[in-house]
């Protein structure tokens, strides 16, 4: 039974990292594209746009880090194994 739980944990860890990276990856690409477009339209507010972009990218990246934490806990601190 432990081998089934271990195999399921590895699969779940891979899915956790993969799925946790899809959403923020799409969001970061969209945010960067819109920031570049905004800077091209109004170059005088580049500093404000860049600061807001970096802050929002950090928040989006935290979602991926949460997925990594879940994956690492499934691999190394799995509560379901005996």
From Swiss-Prot:
Site (Reversibly protonated during proton transport): 61
GO molecular function: lipid binding; proton-transporting ATP synthase activity, rotational mechanism
Pfam families per the UniProt record, alphabetical: ATP-synt_C
InterPro entries per the UniProt record, alphabetical: ATP_synth_csu_bac/chlpt, ATP_synth_F0_csu, ATP_synth_F0_csu_DDCD_BS, ATP_synth_F0_csu_sf, ATPase_proteolipid_c-like_dom, F/V-ATP_Csub_sf
Membrane topology: Multi-pass membrane protein
Gene Ontology, cellular component aspect: chloroplast thylakoid membrane; proton-transporting ATP synthase complex; proton-transporting two-sector ATPase complex, proton-transporting domain
Transmembrane segments: 4-24, 57-77
NCBIfam families noted in UniProt: ATP_synt_c, PRK07354.1
Extra facts: In plastids the F-type ATPase is also known as CF(1)CF(0).
Quaternary context: F-type ATPases have 2 components, F(1) - the catalytic core - and F(0) - the membrane proton channel. F(1) has five subunits: alpha(3), beta(3), gamma(1), delta(1), epsilon(1). F(0) has four main subunits: a(1), b(1), b'(1) and c(10-14). The alpha and beta chains form an alternating ring which encloses part of the gamma chain. F(1) is attached to F(0) by a central stalk formed by the gamma and epsilon chains, while a peripheral stalk is formed by the delta, b and b' chains.
Protein name: ATP synthase subunit c, chloroplastic
Entry's localization field: Plastid, Chloroplast thylakoid membrane
Record keywords, A-Z: ATP synthesis, CF(0), Chloroplast, Hydrogen ion transport, Ion transport, Lipid-binding, Membrane, Plastid, Thylakoid, Transmembrane, Transmembrane helix, Transport
Task of the protein: F(1)F(0) ATP synthase produces ATP from ADP in the presence of a proton or sodium gradient. F-type ATPases consist of two structural domains, F(1) containing the extramembraneous catalytic core and F(0) containing the membrane proton channel, linked together by a central stalk and a peripheral stalk. During catalysis, ATP synthesis in the catalytic domain of F(1) is coupled via a rotary mechanism of the central stalk subunits to proton translocation.
Family: Belongs to the ATPase C chain family.
């Amino acid at each position: 039974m432990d081998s089934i739980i271990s195999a399921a944990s590895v699969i779940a860890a891979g899915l956790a990292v993969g799925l946790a990276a899809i959403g923020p990856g799409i969001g970061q690409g969209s945010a960067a594209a819109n920031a570049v477009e905004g800077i091209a339209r109004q170059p005088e507010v580049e500093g404000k746009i860049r600061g807001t972009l970096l802050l929002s990218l950090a928040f989006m990246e935290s979602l991926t880090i949460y997925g990594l934490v879940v994956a690492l806990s499934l691999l190394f601190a799995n509560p379901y194994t005996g």
